[in-house]
């Protein structure tokens, strides 16, 4: 590289809520990570293949749990819910107290998210439509027959990206009612807080957008970029 070239170092870090006291935890190429208590559950994929492991937030007690893909994104009350990626797409539950795994439901699902009594998921058998499964009643509800690429659920709403010629980011109530379009085009990285939903245009990682929860408007969000620049200046 010539003079002035920028070298990017990949690192998964821990910091305080105000952005201070940054500590590097690992340089593994992480696809998904989840914090449960004081343990991090990490999914990494590199040239050696996938690896799912657990370690403490102080980097100690690293324990390999699986050499295949497990997405730990959905964790509730010490249980990680995930879909199978080997012989089937069943719904599984990992008890983080013991790291034991049990089969919850022999469905055909992708990207499960637990909310109360329900597991929201993409229905693999039916062109990735959005459904929810009741854990207590063993019942399926179809929320939309549209093919979706990704989604997130929380605070009474579901935000989801519709695939196809009329691609758009949409919102509905978490029972499947009152759907509306937020933005036309292809969006991803949908994150939710109690006040806003945040998302990015597919293929464009430098810009974030946000929308007040339950609204029909959205705008650019520069807070993340400004925080990063301020941290760089220190």
Describe each region flagged by the PLM.
Residues 27-37, 67-77, 106-116, 145-155, ...:
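Repeated scaffold domains used in trafficking and secretory/extracellular systems
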Residues 1-5, 41-44, 81-83, 120-122, ...:
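Residue position within the beta-strands of beta-propeller blades
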Residues 18, 36, 58, 77, ...:
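Acidic/polar residues in short coil/turn loops that connect beta-strands
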Residues 7-13, 48-54, 87-93, 126-132, ...:
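Structural motif
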Residues 186-234:
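Blade-level signature of beta-propeller repeat domains, shared across WD40, Kelch, NHL, RCC1
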